[in-house]
């Protein structure tokens, strides 16, 4: 009987192996299609998981691009992936085929966070009616902000003053600016979403920031890729909660803030912020099962604004200050322009940037060199498309290697150096560059770009109006190489802020 049982188990195991190989074979069929992008041979049942460094995929993509060209394919277990490199390929996919590449891959593994057909937020939402509804709402709310007592620019200007006060408290001693930058930018998002600000030592502020930063680390690594490619694994009890505890805790905090905000709402008054405006839309959509305005989606829209809106802008500012202490000649030229255009009596205003071409060029070069979101957010094809002569089938995940655009050697004079002149013409006037894509491109480009540009200019100029920054005496010059954790953070550093 034991022998029979052993034989039966052997047969079942063999049948399972054959079944998995057949499934794997079916998912490889796209590789045999004419003009499908080349790529490394995937392993049965694993695809190319062991051939890509998921702690920092950029390193693997550099090698694969040299071997296979600007458009190459990967197999994420059974999910087909195409990586796009260089300005020509990325522009063709995201701009020329904007409609066909505006979808997102499904995020089944985030169901434990409340994602579903009617609650996808904005950033990760599938391309369709709900996304268009939320994108339109978010853009119009950002544009029309000012329904409350303060305009968005006034909020940023006020927060920049608070940030300067916090820098002054360091009394010229060496310190890392990262935490203070995170707090300042978070308060701008808090003003937009909850019409309030937090004191920099507020325990809730500190916890919120910690959860955002630690939650980012849950976005990278091999296990995350396995779960995305085999979403059936999400049904293993407790697995997702164990792998993404900080993302869950972050959403719990957002729920608490929304609940408190609802209790203070005066319906006789106009909306104070985005949350109030969303609640008004929910009231109008009541009874419409197709509407994306619901409690579940409110928490995700607010969460996306907080996480994406805070960390990208504060990280860019951290890069800006690092590059200023590494390039004091550039810092002096920015300060000279500030002195000539703004002076020392009043604070910078957004209208000043039209008269400050060098400062504007420096901020653009910070974003290009810093390369904050190197791989963008994944897209997915909604139909067969052709890019650079290759046929990419419907349902293929697209990774846009924005690093390869921002550091494209065929476009930039000095792609791997910090060189503000990339954005200046021969007469010293600011000039735009087509390959400047830190916010991506096409229909899914970052909706918060106008807010980010305002924050970067006002925070940066206010800080350089008030302080001169330098490497602390006795410390070596910090590295200008980044640390990858979904975003690209500057290597840890300290600086001294001396009042001017």
Curated annotation (Swiss-Prot):
Heme binds at residue 446. It catalyses: calciol + reduced [NADPH--hemoprotein reductase] + O2 = calcidiol + oxidized [NADPH--hemoprotein reductase] + H2O + H(+); alfacalcidol + reduced [NADPH--hemoprotein reductase] + O2 = calcitriol + oxidized [NADPH--hemoprotein reductase] + H2O + H(+); dodecanoate + reduced [NADPH--hemoprotein reductase] + O2 = 12-hydroxydodecanoate + oxidized [NADPH--hemoprotein reductase] + H2O + H(+); dodecanoate + reduced [NADPH--hemoprotein reductase] + O2 = 11-hydroxydodecanoate + oxidized [NADPH--hemoprotein reductase] + H2O + H(+). It holds the Pfam family p450. Transmembrane segments: none annotated. Found in liver and kidney. It is found in: Endoplasmic reticulum membrane; Microsome membrane. Keywords: Endoplasmic reticulum, Heme, Iron, Membrane, Metal-binding, Microsome, Monooxygenase, Oxidoreductase. CDD domains: CYP2D. It is a peripheral membrane protein. GO terms for cellular component: cytoplasm; endoplasmic reticulum membrane; intracellular membrane-bounded organelle. One of its GO terms (molecular function) is heme binding. Its cofactor is heme. Its EC number is 1.14.14.24. The keyword S-adenosyl-L-methionine does not apply. GO terms for biological process: arachidonate metabolic process; xenobiotic metabolic process. Its main location: endoplasmic reticulum. Catalyzes the 25-hydroxylation of vitamin D(3) (calciol), 1alpha-hydroxyvitamin D(3) (alphacalcidiol) and some C27 steroids. In addition the enzyme catalyzes the hydroxylation of positions 11 and 12 of dodecanoate. Belongs to the cytochrome P450 family. This is Vitamin D(3) 25-hydroxylase. It comes from Sus scrofa (Pig). The gene is CYP2D25.
């Amino acid at each position: 009987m034991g022998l029979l049982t052993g034989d039966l188990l052997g047969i079942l195991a063999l049948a399972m192996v054959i079944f998995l190989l057949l499934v794997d074979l079916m998912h490889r069929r796209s590789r045999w299609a004419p003009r499908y992008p080349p790529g490394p041979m995937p392993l049965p049942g694993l695809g190319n998981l062991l051939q890509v460094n998921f702690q920092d995929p950029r390193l693997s993509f550099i090698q694969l691009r040299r071997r296979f060209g600007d458009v190459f394919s990967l197999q994420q277990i059974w999910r087909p992936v195409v990586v796009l490199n260089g300005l020509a390929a990325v522009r063709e996919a995201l701009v020329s085929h904007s409609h066909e590449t505006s979808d997102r891959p499904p995020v089944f593994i985030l169901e434990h966070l409340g994602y579903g057909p009617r609650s996808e937020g904005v950033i990760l939402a599938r391309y369709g009616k709900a996304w268009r509804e939320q994108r339109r709402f978010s853009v119009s709310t950002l544009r029309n902000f000012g329904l409350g007592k303060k305009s968005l620019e006034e909020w940023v200007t006020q927060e920049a003053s608070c940030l300067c006060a916090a820098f002054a408290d360091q009394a010229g001693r060496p310190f890392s600016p990262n935490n203070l930058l995170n707090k300042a930018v978070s308060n701008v998002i808090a003003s937009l979403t909850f019409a309030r600000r937090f004191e920099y030592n507020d325990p809730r502020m500190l916890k919120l920031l910690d959860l955002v930063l630690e939650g980012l680390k849950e976005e990278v690594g091999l296990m995350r890729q396995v779960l995305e490619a085999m979403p059936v694994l999400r049904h293993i009890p407790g697995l997702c909660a164990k792998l993404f505890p900080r993302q869950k805790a972050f959403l719990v905090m957002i729920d608490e803030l929304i609940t408190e905000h609802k209790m203070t709402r005066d319906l006789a008054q106009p909306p104070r912020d985005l949350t109030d405006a969303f609640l008004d839309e929910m009231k109008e959509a009541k009874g419409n099962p197709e509407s994306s305005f619901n409690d579940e989606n409110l928490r995700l829209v607010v969460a996306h604004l907080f996480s994406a809106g805070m960390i990208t802008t504060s990280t860019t500012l951290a890069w800006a200050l690092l590059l200023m202490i590494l390039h004091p000649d550039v810092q002096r030229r920015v300060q000279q322009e500030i002195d000539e255009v703004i002076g020392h009596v009043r604070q910078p205003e957004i209208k000043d940037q039209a008269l400050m071409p060098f400062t504007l060029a420096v901020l653009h070069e910070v974003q290009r060199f810093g390369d904050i979101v190197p791989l963008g957010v994944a897209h997915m094809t909604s139909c067969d498309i052709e890019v650079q002569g290759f046929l990419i089938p419907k349902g293929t995940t697209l990774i846009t290697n924005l690093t390869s655009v921002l550091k494209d050697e065929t476009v930039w004079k000095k792609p791997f150096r910090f060189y503000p002149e990339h954005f200046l013409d021969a007469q010293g006037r600011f000039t735009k560059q087509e390959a400047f894509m830190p916010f991506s491109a096409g229909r899914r480009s970052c909706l918060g770009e106008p807010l980010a540009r305002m924050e970067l200019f006002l925070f940066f100029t206010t800080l350089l109006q008030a302080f001169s920054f330098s490497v602390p005496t006795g410390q070596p010059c910090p590295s200008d190489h980044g640390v990858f954790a979904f975003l690209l953070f500057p290597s840890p550093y300290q600086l001294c802020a001396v009042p001017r």
